[in-house]
């Protein structure tokens, strides 16, 4: 019998990894990004559009590759990627398409977090292999050619657009078209921001992002359709049938992963399904922690920076929570009737997934839905029906039956969105809580200790869990008191007033982006407040309950 190592070594190794990641976070986050310093000033730059433009209220957001920069007497060749924010001057402005070569006059800005605890958009862009973001008006942008983009993601995006048009041809329109395209194809560019917020507040944001839920639905449908081939055969033929069936299933699943853009969550799900199918052919155990670890290793081998992707972290933490906690939660509620077992499974899986993703969700979004159980009891079966109807509509788009299916999709998606909006408007639908990396580490350790207590039934793990949660609460109280000392940000004319505690400081604003430092660690980007910039400042202040006294 193989030697069994005490579980405490696994606990200590995990704790060491968490602490190491916590300390490694700071050098990465605070190190000076010296790359592309020559892009800080406005220059004429030639760029290549890599992906379809994303519609925004101000115009379009483009993912581009910087090709060259024109200086006074020379041309500098570039190779970095960036985001290009294109503001349309007129309603008839020409929209660049994938593959277009543009000539723009702009500068690349590397954003910084405005206040302590704010989302660091500049760090996010670096993790997406982008040096920054450039702002340009459509009148300052000229198309000078087109070079087709031949990357795998570009081909996937083009395939997505063709399938979205099939939905439109079948009769889907408006918000229903955007919603169905999001949950079946992963095309979320046309989703309204208010709808995204509604699903997040109701605890159903996972439905909008194609992930293991949607991949599992497609997998179940494909298996159901293919398993009627052949009946019980002798052993050799049975093995051959298993191999052929698995090959067909995996071919379809990887094609679906390609269509949805090869996001980390879909890759994780399809990789796990691949391992499951291989195990089924070899008659081995299917889903386990080893399967999840193998999928994570393959994803990180392909792209190490995906470790810092929110999608990657949410996907793997949700599955980890389900694998660890669901067996024990199910044992607390034995259910024999099918209907009762369905309700139990939805509840236990939802609780386990929320528990697994809680540290990540609080760190990035600062909120958690209180009524996620009420939401998932309705949303999960509705999502199954929507995905099945959506795939059937794509297949039968130009037939009478396809038109009927599209009408059913339109009705069901509209009803589901209204239900989610109703959940959002219930009293106390969300719990707002901003956490620091230290508090995230406390939450992870608390979840790990809870699992060890359930598994080992030893009081020491419960005591450790209570101590860790006490540390979490102390840290939260300290941060709340510190935040209370820095509340008000006001602008009057060209003077910025900043209140921290009982004192008020004032700073003159320049006619450009200005960098300010308050106290020891808080940073603010302020700008000369007039016109559209003042509207942007208003939106920012309203979102964070910051007061603008007067603007002249």
Spell out what each predicted region is.
Residues 172-176, 241-248, 382:
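Membrane-interfacial loop-to-helix junctions in multi-pass transporters
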